[in-house]
Amino acid sequence: MSYKVEESLIQDSNAAISYTGTWKVATSTKHSGGTCKYVSSAATATYKFTGTGIKLIASKSSDKGIAKVTIDSKVYYVDLYSASAKDQSVAFSLSGLTSGTHTIKVEWTGLKNNSSKGNAITLDAFEIN
């Protein structure tokens, strides 16, 4: 069986991303595609993709928290804190997945780095390999 591998940038506004909770939209030229979603309460963003790897593109800053990222039932915690603002950052990257269909879920945890002033998480885009 063979699979078509996607090589693309999936923007936060893509209808194939399933959102729960109250995500808000920040509009700016500093974001990939001109927008970035953010949330600071219970919420998830889920996307099914075909490929062997994925990157989470997000905004990092001094008021961001820790996101829970789940890929095919494996859990990773991603700290979006940065002392200075960093837009379009590769916040998380995973390669070496078996060729096929996978699911990524990004979830607000309420957790934060001790240096952070807040616990919001962001989603700017996914990059599929």
Task: Indicate where each model-derived feature is located.
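Glycan-recognition surfaces in beta-rich domains, encompassing non-catalytic CBMs
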Residues: M1-N129
